[in-house]
Amino acid sequence: VFRRQRQMCIRDRNHLEKTDIKDKKVGLRVDLNVPIENGEILSHERLSAALPTILHILKQTDKLCVITHLGRPREGEFDINQSVLPIKKWFEKRLNMNIELLNNFENIPDNICFMENIRFFKGEKDNDKNLSQQIANVFDVYVMDAFATAHRTAASTFGAIELSKNACAGLLFSDEIKNLESALEENKQILSVVGGSKVSTKLEVIKNLITKSSSVVVGGGIANTFLKAAGKPIGNSLVEDNMLDT
């Protein structure tokens, strides 16, 4: 998945800065998956990182719909605790404008809006073609800026890109690719650090990094699975038992 998106965004030079979005309806897939407790956002780093792309788009069009996931809700069910409402409110304050919160792709307004948690939508996780087509059809330009979830074959991070009339990489995504290309240049000693909770979603990335890195360090929940596979005690820590023999 990552290789195909990289080919689309880099080799074909489909960058946001080189894409005509003047007065176009733009869908922006970002990764604003931040910790929220009692409606309060505990970390604003990912929100701040998304601002340059959002501001770049708003300079050329008001027709922007921001799409993100948040947590791991049960697909097809609304969960107020995993609503993007607090995130929308944060951007309203930063941008000093009212932002509408939507729950479907049927009536996208001609002004900035936020789509509700994309993982509430049936078919997102399994890259359902109908959902992918629905997302792709409603926008003139679809911008992928969710680098941290680019490895997922979900409807909003993969299917919609393939089916979009005009898809491109956002500013953050392009910067991450440039940094990776620089890091992976020949004759460099590379230490790769991989975190996260699930080995299953990072396995191919880890395999690729092993061939390109001097050393690979795993942390977070991923490390627990490696430790248990090596026979080390991990107590009640998060682990993927189905990946122990991989």
Indicate residue ranges for each PLM-predicted region:
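Single conserved hydrophobic/aromatic residue that forms the stacking wall/gate
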Residues: 1-10
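Active-site loop-to-helix "anion-binding N-cap" substructures in soluble metabolic enzymes
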Residues: 11-246
